[in-house]
Every structure is written in C-alpha cells, then in structure tokens.
C-alpha cells in the first residue's frame, strides 16, 4: 500500500502537517491543503488515492461537506474520510449519506486513520477492478459498426476530439448523440477530468438557472457547486440545447464570452470547460422563429457533427443485434440467442424512426417475450419480433403470406415474387446496387435491367457509372 497519494484538507496547519508526517512514515505520499481552492486545484492536477477532509474549514469558500459533494461528483470512487473536532451525530450521518467512506472525531489515534485509509484504498481498488472487468464485456463508449458510414463517422469523432473548440452534435432522437459526446471526451486531452451531462428538458426556467448558475435569491447563502463548477477542467454535454429558455440563453451567452460565473456572494469564478451540445431540432429554424439566440448558436456551433441515423447504417444491424444480446445477457440475466438470417433481413428492411434506442428495445422485448423452451440456443425467427416491425419491413415478410400467387400462372407469380423480393433487398441495402447485386448473386448490369423490367425505381446516386447504366438500359 506504499506510495499512495493522500490529500489532507484541514485549516489548522499544525494538524495537517502532523497527519502528513505520520502518513509519510507509514509509506503514503501526503499532499496538504488549507481550503477548498487549494484542495480542488490539487485534485484537478492529479487525482489522489484518498482524501482526509476536515468539515469545518475557516476562511474557505466551500466547507468540508461542499468539497465532499464535488469530489463524489467528479471522482465517484475516490474514498473520503471525514475528520472533525466538534461534529455531531447528525453531521456524521449526513457525511456518510453523501458518500464519505467513514467519519472520525479529533483527536484520533494515528493507527486508526492508517487502518481506515488502507482499507478504503483496498475497497476502491476492488471496485475499480470490478468496473474494469465489466468494461471488457460492455463499453459504454463503444461505437458498434463497420459499414462505410460508421467508419467515416468514427473518423469525424476522432477529429472532433483533437479540437478544443465547441461542438454541436446534430442527430435524430435515439441516434446516439450522448454516445458521440462521450467518445469525444474519451479521446480528448480532458479524458481524466469530469464528463458531466446536463439535460434541460422538462426543467423549469428557475431550475435550469439554479443548476447552471446557482443564482436563486432564496438560496443566496447556498454554496452548492453549479453544473459548470462540477464540469470544471472537463467536458459539459448539454442535451437538447434548444430546450433552454431565452432568459437562460442570454446568461449562457455571457458565460461563453468570458468563461466566468458570479456566485451569489459576488465572487467571480473562472471556469475552463469544453462544451458539447446536442440537438434533434434544426437550430437554424429555431433561430429564424426567434426561439434561439443567433449569437449563441454561432458560439456553440463552432464545429458541427452529424450523427447518422440507423436507417443510414442498416449494414451494422447484425453487429448491433449481437452486441445488444450480449449486453442484455450480461446485465439483465436474459439468455443469449441467435437471430435467424431472415429475422435480421426483416430488421434491416425496417426504417427505424427511433434509431439505435428503438433497435435495442426491440431486441430486449424479443428476448423477454420469447423465453427458451429448451436448454438450447433457440433461433429467433421473424414471427418472434414485434408485429409492427414485420408490418413495416418493406414487404419483406409479405413473401410468406402471398398465398394468392397460387391462383396465378407461373410467369405472373414469378414476376410478383421477383418484384417483392428485389424491392425488399434494395430497401435492405439502402438502394445500393453493388451490395444488392452481390447478395442476390447477379451482375450489376443484369440487376439494373431486371429492376427496369419490374418498374422498380433506382435513385441516381446509387446507379453504376453512366456508361454501364446506359448499356444496361439500352
């Protein structure tokens, strides 16, 4: 347990130096701070293994409980041992509820503190190992997919992560805007600092104001840190930024100009954060309609990132389904199942208005509603997925219900089948001629001729080169 960094925060110099000397003799590497400013500066430079924190700090802007709250927000696993010379049972209980590892009263036996620190660091080490083990199976910042659209998107995220400018992420509901923000933070220089998510949706104007700036008159003496303070030195992601009311937009614009917030006590605090915003709306339309400040839009949209919809990433659906099945099996106790090729085809033919989130919900619903009847891995067939998916899967599943073809002559029935089959496959591969022809086993020019014969339209952007197209349609 040697050379573990321990931060000692106490306003009395003699006490903090005594604790530091004792801990150094026991093999720890102590650091000392007299107030919240010094303590938070040390933590921002390099997180420590544990903190010994006095509750009553004279001359400190934030008291011990306030520092504890900040630490548990920024560094959830960091153990904090509270010390106090004149505390109460109520204070001790509050500290434990807020996440303190333990509470001891001054004067205390040095051996007791060493035992507590050693135990706290061991427990934290086990927690970290457990989290690392889980992350090997499921990574919350893993972008699953290998199609060309996804690869380009991954490159755009990597490029955005190297920039220090503000980024606005545009994407439909459920497409993964928060994931994009997490990936940008994970690949940036701020990776070891806080990543804070703020969603103003369903909040009142007063609540948004309190969370961001902490300026409620009724709470003028409240020293609770704001969201901006929690995110200091890290990344703040504001989800659905267009839901912020105009009065708060004005304050946010002022903050972006000078990167400073004014506390109720009148003190100005400099904040260093990377701001990423997300929106499913057309912000330019919101500006034109007077619902969003134009200047704020330009300051937040310095760099723009578009999240592709699942409809644009249909080729990733097989990988996504496997990923969600494994995730649900690991953390929800559902049995792993394989999805039949025809089931995957049905999923690929659906338009997915709810994007990735909807696909995950469909996979979970399917596993729950179709429990294993044997100990074997029963294949998920098309009839097992939600009926609305089948009903809207671009006629793919209608092939199974075409009993009326039995009353047709062979040539007519074959034409009906080919039209339905090729229409479904074209939809499945986003009207991509090369991929569709490869899957169905036809030359591209032959597929073009067949589609023209069946009166199936091909978008110009998905045609082969003009020479080959003209030859196929000659």
Swiss-Prot record:
Entry keywords, A to Z: ATP-binding, Nucleotide-binding, Phosphoprotein, Transcription, Transcription regulation, Two-component regulatory system
PANTHER family per UniProt: TRANSCRIPTIONAL REGULATOR (NTRC FAMILY), TRANSCRIPTIONAL REGULATORY PROTEIN
CDD domains: AAA, REC_NtrX-like
Positions carrying 4-aspartylphosphate: 54
Sequence positions that bind ATP: 171-178, 231-240
Protein name as it appears in the record: Putative response regulator NtrX-like
Top-level taxon in the UniProt lineage: Bacteria
GO molecular function, one term: ATP binding
Sigma-54 factor interaction domain boundaries: 143-368
Organism: Rickettsia conorii (strain ATCC VR-613 / Malish 7)
Response regulatory domain residues: 5-121
GO biological processes: phosphorelay signal transduction system; regulation of DNA-templated transcription
Functional summary from the UniProt entry: Member of the two-component regulatory system RC0849/RC0948.
Keyword Ion transport recorded: no
């Amino acid at each position: 347990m040697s050379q573990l960094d321990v931060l000692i925060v106490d306003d009395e110099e003699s006490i903090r130096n005594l604790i530091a000397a004792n801990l150094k003799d026991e093999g720890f590497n102590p650091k000392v701070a007299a107030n919240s400013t010094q303590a938070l500066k040390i933590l921002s430079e390099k997180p420590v293994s544990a903190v010994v924190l006095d509750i009553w700090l004279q001359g400190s802007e934030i008291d011990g409980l306030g520092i504890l709250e900040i630490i548990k927000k920024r560094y959830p696993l960091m153990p904090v041992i509270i010390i106090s010379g004149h505390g109460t049972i109520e204070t001790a209980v509050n500290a434990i509820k807020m996440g303190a590892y333990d509470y001891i009263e001054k004067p205390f036996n040095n051996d007791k503190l060493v035992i507590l620190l050693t135990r706290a660091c061991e427990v934290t080490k086990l927690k970290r190992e457990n989290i690392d083990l889980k992350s090997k199976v499921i990574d919350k910042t893993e972008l699953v997919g290998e199609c060309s659209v996804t690869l380009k998107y991954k490159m755009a995220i990597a490029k955005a992560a190297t920039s220090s400018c503000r980024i606005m992420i545009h994407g439909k509901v459920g497409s993964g805007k928060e994931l994009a923000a997490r990936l940008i933070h994970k690949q940036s220089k701020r990776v070891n600092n806080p990543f804070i998510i703020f969603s103003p949706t369903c909040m009142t104007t007063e609540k948004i104001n309190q969370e961001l700036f902490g300026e409620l008159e009724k709470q003028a003496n409240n020293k609770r840190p704001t969201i901006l303070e929690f995110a200091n030195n890290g990344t703040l992601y504001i989800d659905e930024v267009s839901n912020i009311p105009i009065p708060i937009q004005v304050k946010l614009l002022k903050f972006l100009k000078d990167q400073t917030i004014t506390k109720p006590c009148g003190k100005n605090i400099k904040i260093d954060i990377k701001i990423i915003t997300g929106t499913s709306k057309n912000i330019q339309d919101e500006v034109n309609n007077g619902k969003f400040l134009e200047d704020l839009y330009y300051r937040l949209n310095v760099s723009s990132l578009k999240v592709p919809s699942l409809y644009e990433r249909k080729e990733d659906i097989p990988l996504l389904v496997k990923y969600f099945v494994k995730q649900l099996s690991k953390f929800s106790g559902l049995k792993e199942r394989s999805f039949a090729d025809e089931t995957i085809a049905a999923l690929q033919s659906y338009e997915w208005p709810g994007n990735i989130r909807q696909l995950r919900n469909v996979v979970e619903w399917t596993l729950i509603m179709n429990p294993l009847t044997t100990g074997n891995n029963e294949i998920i067939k098309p009839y097992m997925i939600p009926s609305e998916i089948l009903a809207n899967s671009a006629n793919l599943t209608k092939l199974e219900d075409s009993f009326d073809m039995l009353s047709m002559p062979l040539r007519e029935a074959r034409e009906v089948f080919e039209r339905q089959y090729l229409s479904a496959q074209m939809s499945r591969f986003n009207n991509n001629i090369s991929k569709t022809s490869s899957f169905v086993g036809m030359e591209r020019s032959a597929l073009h001729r067949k589609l023209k014969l069946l009166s199936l339209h091909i978008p110009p952007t998905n045609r082969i080169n003009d020479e080959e197209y003209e030859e196929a349609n000659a």
